[in-house]
């Protein structure tokens, strides 16, 4: 039999074992599509971002007009920009659903894969933040000022740290230049960490909805899941294109149509929708350092999830009490997202504080208790 180049060539061999002959569980559902969708999002963002960067000027006096120029005068510049801006939203939708899947089906018990995933989330958040600042609109300028200023809450070195990050005493030219450099660099770092994420995943193989070993029943990734992923991709690209072509500014802030003005503050400073849950948690604590710590904890709490797993079963498939708790957590996050977009006044303040409290309580206290309770009910 002639040797198969797919299995013998040093580079094709890696692709083959990762994407073609990879043994995959036969019963993984559409919730397992989001990994490949995230990879497609990353590719789309890098390509559209590169095309935008060729027409962008990282200068406070020119940034806003260079983006306007891209939209008006560059061939399909409006489409590239709309795809890039809304592509970021879809990136976050996919990553939140991907994390939700991991929580529901106990994928976090693959600790290395989970931890690299959390690092990926943090890097993505950093990338989105520095990118949002670049077009120098009113909201993005003030968002950058407020969020970077949070570092001044760090005792002793805080103020020095902020001025070092800004490159001056306010968000100005040096800030924009370094944010552009970071925004260009970080997606490639994300791509690198993604490869590590996959390497760890392929050590153990995919989890499945039953949470049991699937060694006895594996199928090749191609053609089964490659085709399933293409369907998922089509189902994601359709709403992305619909959004980019029909209502590209739906998720943006109207304040960003005004060029940045350091002398006037917008009435309600708020980040993009995908950061609102964390922003609501930040605002719910009436103390700067406390708020910053809660903000950090709201994402870093994911690193504790593997240690809070007390159930003898891996997934929530057959654990109705944990399921109820999971969907309460999901609803809670939606409430936090809504609160983050509202002004700081009654009744939003108290709703935000209650939602923030229940967010941490659910994860840190209720999940382990319910897990233990279910063990007892099932006589484990």
Curated annotation (Swiss-Prot):
The lineage of its organism: Eukaryota, Metazoa, Chordata, Craniata, Vertebrata. GO terms for biological process: mitochondrial electron transport, ubiquinol to cytochrome c. The cytochrome bc1 complex contains 11 subunits: 3 respiratory subunits (MT-CYB, CYC1 and UQCRFS1), 2 core proteins (UQCRC1 and UQCRC2) and 6 low-molecular weight proteins (UQCRH/QCR6, UQCRB/QCR7, UQCRQ/QCR8, UQCR10/QCR9, UQCR11/QCR10 and a cleavage product of UQCRFS1). This cytochrome bc1 complex then forms a dimer. PANTHER family: CYTOCHROME B. The keyword Metal-binding applies. Keywords: Electron transport, Heme, Iron, Membrane, Metal-binding, Mitochondrion, Mitochondrion inner membrane, Respiratory chain, Transmembrane, Transmembrane helix, Transport, Ubiquinone. Heme b b562 binds at residues 84, 183. It is found in: Mitochondrion inner membrane. Belongs to the cytochrome b family. The chain crosses the membrane at residues 34-54, 78-99, 114-134, 179-199, 227-247, 289-309, 321-341, 348-368. This is Cytochrome b. Its main location: mitochondrion. Heme 1 (or BL or b562) is low-potential and absorbs at about 562 nm, and heme 2 (or BH or b566) is high-potential and absorbs at about 566 nm.
């Amino acid at each position: 039999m002639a040797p198969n180049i797919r299995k013998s060539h040093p580079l094709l061999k890696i692709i083959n074992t990762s994407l073609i002959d990879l043994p995959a569980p036969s019963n993984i559902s559409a919730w397992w599509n989001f990994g490949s969708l995230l990879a497609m999002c990353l590719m789309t963002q890098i390509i559209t971002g590169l095309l935008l960067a060729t027409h962008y000027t990282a200068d406070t006096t020119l940034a806003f007009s260079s983006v306007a120029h891209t939209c008006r005068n560059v061939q399909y510049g409006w489409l590239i920009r709309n795809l890039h801006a809304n592509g970021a939203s879809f990136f976050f939708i996919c990553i939140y659903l991907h994390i939700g899947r991991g929580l529901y089906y106990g994928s976090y018990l693959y600790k290395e894969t989970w931890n690299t995933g959390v690092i990926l989330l943090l890097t993505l958040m950093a990338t989105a933040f520095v990118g949002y600042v670049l077009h120098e609109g009113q909201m993005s300028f003030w968002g950058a000022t407020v969020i970077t200023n949070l570092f001044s809450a760090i005792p002793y070195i805080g103020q020095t740290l902020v001025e070092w990050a800004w490159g001056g005493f306010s968000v100005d030219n040096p800030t924009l230049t370094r944010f552009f450099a970071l925004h260009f660099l970080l997606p490639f770092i994300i791509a690198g960490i993604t490869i590590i994420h996959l390497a760890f995943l392929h050590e153990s193989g995919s989890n499945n909805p039953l949470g049991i070993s699937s060694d006895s029943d594996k199928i090749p990734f191609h053609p089964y899941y490659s085709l399933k992923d293409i369907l998922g991709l089509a189902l994601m690209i359709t709403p992305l294109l619909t959004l980019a072509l029909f209502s590209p500014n739906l998720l943006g802030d109207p304040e960003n149509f005004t060029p940045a003005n350091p002398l006037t503050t917008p009435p309600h400073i708020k980040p993009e929708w995908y950061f609102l849950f964390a922003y609501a948690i930040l605002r719910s604590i009436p103390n700067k350092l406390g708020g910053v710590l809660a903000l950090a904890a709201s994402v870093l709490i994911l690193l504790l999830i593997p240690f809070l797993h007390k159930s003898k079963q891996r997934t929530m498939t057959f654990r109705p009490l944990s399921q109820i708790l999971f969907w309460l957590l999901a609803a809670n996050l939606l409430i936090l997202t809504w609160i983050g977009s509202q002004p700081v006044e009654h009744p939003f303040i108290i709703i935000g504080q209650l939602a923030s409290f229940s967010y941490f309580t659910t994860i840190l206290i209720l999940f382990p208790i319910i897990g233990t309770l279910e063990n007892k009910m099932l006589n484990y």
